[in-house]
Amino acid sequence: LRLAANGIKAYIFETLRPTPELSFAVRHLGCVAGINVTASHNPPEYNGYKVYWEDGAQVTAPKDHEIIDEVEHVTDFHTVKTMSKDDAIEAGLYQYIGEEIDVAYMEELKKQIIHPEIIKEVADELKIVYTPFHGTGNKPVRRILAELGFKHVYVVPEQERPDPAFTTLDYPNPEDPKAFTLALKLAKKVDADIVLATDPDADRLGIYAKDSKTGEDMPFTGNMSGMLIAEYILRERTATNRMPVDPVMVSTIVTTNMAAAIAADYNVELREVLTGFKYIGEQIKWMEQAGKGHYVFGPEESYGCLAGTHARDKDAIVASMALCEAAAYYKLRGKTI
């Protein structure tokens, strides 16, 4: 309503959506910016303000500093313009969005699938446990897996519904093994192959997978999951002649050196950037502007990655999809991930 009062049209999701879908929506709707209020994987008192620019990536310098400068100039909140919702809607400055964006987002995700036929072959066998940690990933992760044909997705019932207090968790972080307690209990019950957890704003993915030798569920670090997905995507895109010209993988300087080895093995350029996924998103924009290099994948050690360019921020929904496709590929060959 503050935006509307200043003559700026705003699209508002009618209910919860994951952070990467906002990044997608900014681009899809041709917006100049996007705003997301979230605490991400932190406790609710850390609720904060994420800003995305017209390319769908989080703002970098100098825009981030300029935004804070404007905020600090406000000394009296009563001077900030506002208007009623009814007036904003009547003026065409306040518009709800929802299912139409969901559908477009799902279709973009599906473009990243390499072997849909393999998913169908093992759909009756592969068992997946998933928890959204009371957050926004619940509907989109389940939807994309169902639409791709995965038949056995078991959601942790205690953590299925949105809960801003994260009642069942000390810390809703997929890096924390304790956060997987309920998911691992369910995995034992259903004899799951893999366990997935997305953080509350669904931009990071945590994984456990069954060890074929011990039968125990083993945790993956962000480096491990990122490299597994990277190797699968680069290998299978190369094998199916779906690798673009001048392919580029982008990772951060604190991500494992294995990224360089994998990229070199498939003749993919590796670019390393500063810590923070916003710098990976920035690289995609620069490639497009220069007309040189085609982004394929971007992993970071802190459990985030992005396959494709539909969004410009880490995306746990596309990561879940890619991981499950890889798991299906290996299961068909009698292997676990």
Model-derived features: positions:
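Gly/Ser/Thr-enriched, mixed-charge loops and adjacent short helices
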Residues: 47-181, 185-187
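Glycine-rich phosphate-binding loop plus the immediately following alpha-helix
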Residues: 52-82, 223-247, 251-262, 316, ...
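Flexible loop/turn segments at secondary-structure boundaries
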Residues: 19-21, 42-45, 136-138, 162-165, ...
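N-terminal small/polar loop signature for handling phosphorylated ligands or for N-terminal nucleophile
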Residues: 1-46, 149-207
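Hydrophobic alpha-helical scaffolding
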Residues: 11-12, 53, 57-61, 94-100, ...
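Short Gly/Thr/Asp-enriched flexible loops that form oxyanion-binding sites at enzyme active sites
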Residues: 1-3, 46-53, 203-223, 259
